[in-house]
Amino acid sequence: MYNVKKDFPIFKNQGDPYVYLDSAATTHKPQCVIDSIVDYYSSSYATVNRALYTASHDITFAHWQVRSKVGSWIGAQYDQEIIFTRGTTSSLNLLAIAANDSWLAGGTVVISEAEHHANLVSWELACQRSGATIKKVRVDDEGMVDCSHLEQLLKQGVQLVSLAHVSNVSGAVLPLPEIAHLVHRYEALFAVDGAQGVGKGPLNLSEWGVDFYAFSGHKLYAPTGIGVLYGKKELLESLPPVEGGGDMVIVYDFEELSYQEPPLRFEAGTPHIAGVLGLGAAIDYLQALPFSITDRLTELTHFLYEQLLTVPGIQIIGPKQGAARGSLCSISIPGVQASDLGFLLDGRGISVRSGHQCSQPAMVRWDLGHVLRASLGIYNEQQDILLFVEALKDILRAYRS
C-alpha cells in the first residue's frame, strides 16, 4: 500500500505518536505544496496580470493555469468560472454581498437548520442589509435535508437556496444533483458550501446543476488564505463587483467606470499568488496519487464508524453505517464534556476537535452542547483510528470509575 504519510513532512517533525484526526478543520500539506511556495518566493517571484517583463509573464501564465486545474477538479465548464478568494467564508460572503446588490433585495434565502456559521451568518448579514428574508429548511435525525419541506418553501417563492455539501457536524452528504433539480424547478438558484466536500474526490458541478460552490484550499491540502468561488459563467456576469481596486476595472476616469469580465471583476488588488500556486500543486499531487481518494476515505470512514460502535455509551451523530457520510464522525457522551476528552486525548498525541464546530444551530437541532469530532485525511491509516478508539475507551473507563 502506498505510504501517504511520507509525503507530508509534519509527520516526521512531530512527536511520536502523532495521530491527526482533525482534517475537517484543516489538512496538512505535502512537501510538493511547500516546495511550490518556497520556489515562488525564492526563484520566480513577480506579480501577475500587471507587467510585460518575463518573470511576470511566466507567473501570470502559471497563476491562470491553476484556474484550469481547479476547474478540472470540480467539473467547471470554463476557467472564467473560478474566482480566487481567501477561503470558503470569503467566497460565501462575496456571493452574499453581490447577490444583495443585485437580485436578492426583498426576496427569500433558504438555508438548513444545521449549517456552519460561514453559510449562516453571511446570508444573515446580507438579508439584514437588503430586507430579504431567511427561512430554514429542516434536516432529519441523520442530517439530511427534508426535501418535502424544501419544496414547500420553494413554492412560497425563493431566490436562492444555500446548503452544505457535507455537514461538518453530522457528516451527511447531500445529493446535489437531486436538490439542484428541485431548486431549479421553482426558478431559484442553488449555492453550496463545499468546505467539507471538495477534498473527498473530484466533483462534477456543471453536470450536477450547481450554480455556486465555495471552498477553501487549506481543506484540500493547499495553503491557508486561498479559496475558490465557482459560479456559472452567465450568473457571474450578472453580478456586480463587491470590492474596488487594481485590475478589476477596464476604464475609470471620474466620468466613466467599466468593469472587467469575471473572474477579474471579483479579484481586486494583488492576489495571494503563492496560495494559488500552492493550490495548483495540491491538485497536481492529488491527481497523481495511485489510488482513489474517494474510495480510501470511504473505507477509512466506515472503519472509524465500526470502531466507535465498540465504545460503550456514546452517540454517533449523523448517518448510519452504510449511508453516504463525509470523512468524519461526531460523537456525544452523556455526562462527559467533549472539551475534557479533547484535552486528555491531546495528552496522548491524538488531535481531535471538541466544541460546537462553529455550528451552534446544529447543536440545537440535535440537543447537544458540544461534540467530539474525529475527521480523516488521505494520510490517515487504520492504525490511527485504533489508537484513537483505544485511548478514548481508556479515558472513559478512568472517567467513569
Swiss-Prot record:
It comes from the Bacteria. It comes from Chlamydia trachomatis serovar D (strain ATCC VR-885 / DSM 19411 / UW-3/Cx). Its cofactor is pyridoxal 5'-phosphate. InterPro entries: Aminotrans_V_dom, Aminotrans_V_PyrdxlP_BS, Cys_dSase_SufS, Cysteine_dSase, PyrdxlP-dep_Trfase, PyrdxlP-dep_Trfase_major, PyrdxlP-dep_Trfase_small. It is an enzyme of class 2 (transferase). GO terms for biological process: cysteine metabolic process. This is Probable cysteine desulfurase. It catalyses: (sulfur carrier)-H + L-cysteine = (sulfur carrier)-SH + L-alanine. The active site is at C358 (cysteine persulfide intermediate). The gene is csd. Belongs to the class-V pyridoxal-phosphate-dependent aminotransferase family. Csd subfamily. The modification N6-(pyridoxal phosphate)lysine is found at K219. GO terms for molecular function: cysteine desulfurase activity; pyridoxal phosphate binding. Keywords: Pyridoxal phosphate, Transferase.
